[in-house]
Every structure is written in C-alpha cells, then in structure tokens.
Amino acid sequence: MFSPADNIFIILITGEFILGILGNGYIALVNWIDWIKKKKISTVDYILTNLVIARICLISVMVVNGIVIVLNPDVYTKNKQQIVIFTFWTFANYLNMWITTCLNVFYFLKIASSSHPLFLWLKWKIDMVVHWILLGCFAISLLVSLIAAIVLSCDYRFHAIAKHKRNITEMFXVSKIPYFEPLTLFNLFAIVPFIVSLISFFLLVRSLWRHTKQIKLYATGSRDPSTEVHVRAIKTMTSFIFFFFLYFISSILMTFSYLMTKYKLAVEFGEIAAILYPLGHSLILIVLNNKLRQIFVRMLTCRKIACVI
C-alpha cells in the first residue's frame, strides 16, 4: 500500500516523464522532418537533435531509477540491478552534459565577435568537426560509465551490510552508504563540461557588452538583429545554468539522503527536482528557437481551426 507521498510522487514523476518525452520528441521530430525535406541539416539542429535524444534517455533512466528506489528499496540488496541502473544513468547524464556544452560553445562561436586568431580558427572549424566532437562526447560518456560500473562492481561492502538487516526500510538507508563516495565522485566530474559552458556564457556576455557599447555610438533607437541574437543565446545559456544547478543540488540531496530522517521523502523530492533539468531546458529551447516556436504555434492554430470546423 502506497503512502500519500508515494502517490503524489508517482503522479508528478509520470507527468514530468510525459512532458519530457513530448517536448524532446517534438524537437527531434521537427528537425528530422526538416532534414528529410531539405536533404541537409544545420549544425545547430544537428546538435539539438542529438541532445534531445540523449535527454529522452536521461529522463527515462531517471524515472525508472526513482520508481525503483522508492517503490522497491530492496533493489540495493541486488548488486547487479543497481549497477545496471547507475551505469545507464551515468552514461545518459554525461552524454547530455557534454552535448549541451557543445551547444553552448557553438552559440558562443557563431554569435560572438572577436579578432583573436584562435577564436576565428574555431569559428571556421566548428561546422566541419561537429560530427567528430559529438562522437567524442559519446566516447567520453561511455568510458566514464564503464569506469563507474567497474568501481561499483568492485565494491561489495553494501551487500555485506544489507544482508544482516531484516527490515527493508533499514536496508534502504544503510545500503546507500557505500555508494556515497562513487556517486559524489562522478557527480563532481560532471562539473567539467559545466565549467566550459560557464566560460562560454561569460565570454558571450562580454561580447554582447562590447557590441552594445559600439551600437551606442550609432544610436538608432532600436536593437539591431545581432543584439537580439546575443540576448536570445544568453537567455538559453542562463536557463541551462539555472536548471543544471537545480539538477546538481538535487543529485547531492539524493546522495546524502541516507543521513536524513526522512530519507525516502528526500529521494522523492530530489528525483522530481532533478528531472526538471532535461525537461525545463528543452522547453526553453522550444520557446527561444524561432523555427520550433513558429511550427508549434501553427500546430496549435490548425488544431483550433479543426475544432471549430
């Protein structure tokens, strides 16, 4: 029998799962159809398509992990099951982080202006090497997830502790302790791509400041297209920073949940908050991307007309 908190958790996480799949699936479908029609795809759409596929995987793994942990806490007594879940989560998490970083760096290189030779070389090269960069993201994520699987496979201490516990609730709390160090370590590794995104963000803000300063010399009373593009990209990157910070804090909360009296409630809250990252940022991308937003508005308009008819 589920408690009221469990019922609320299931309802919320199911709603997030549906919205996440629909939102990310919409981006992938629009870009795929556009690719088929034009026989080619832009670099930003190519990165976005790979990103939303990674996010669909991440959302799916997080939902499965949340439901399994909360509704079947004795999963921690079965080493292989927990290792499989954590390995897939690590892979999807890192793949999502690195591709998002690629998107942020791409925005910076394409929108910002600079006369630095390295910047100009990267700006020229990015379109030609994006396939290899994304392949590198896949390879890094796969390598880290395999290392995570090996580390957890070598750590059987939690099984030795859990098998002496008769109460499943106690088992849930105690068996997470050995995962503290690996979880914390792999969470900290995710800071690396985030720092790269943060650097790109500040450099883009600096570029906007310099551009705005130049525009003031030729004040026209309205923003020029370049300024609008700068602002839109900064909004996208700001939303990423916000949602990733929420995701990171939620991951830390779940990692330390075994120290809390209401650990089960902490895990439920952490899972719900963490899923907002791959869900919320993708919805922001739809709103700020002209093509995605216009197609969505046309779909809603056609639906309203069909309902009236």
UniProtKB/Swiss-Prot annotation:
Protein source organism: Pan troglodytes
Entry protein name: Taste receptor type 2 member 8
PROSITE patterns membership: G_PROTEIN_RECEP_F1_2
Annotated membrane topology: Multi-pass membrane protein
Positions of transmembrane segments: 8-28, 51-71, 83-103, 132-152, 185-205, 240-260, 267-287
One Pfam entry name: TAS2R
All ranges on the Cytoplasmic side of the membrane: 29-50, 104-131, 206-239, 288-309
Family: Belongs to the G-protein coupled receptor T2R family.
Keyword match Transmembrane: yes
Annotated gene: TAS2R8
Keyword set, alphabetical order: G-protein coupled receptor, Glycoprotein, Membrane, Receptor, Sensory transduction, Taste, Transducer, Transmembrane, Transmembrane helix
Main location: membrane
Extra remark: Most taste cells may be activated by a limited number of bitter compounds; individual taste cells can discriminate among bitter stimuli.
Record topological domains on the Extracellular side: 1-7, 72-82, 153-184, 261-266
Gene Ontology process terms (BP): detection of chemical stimulus involved in sensory perception of bitter taste
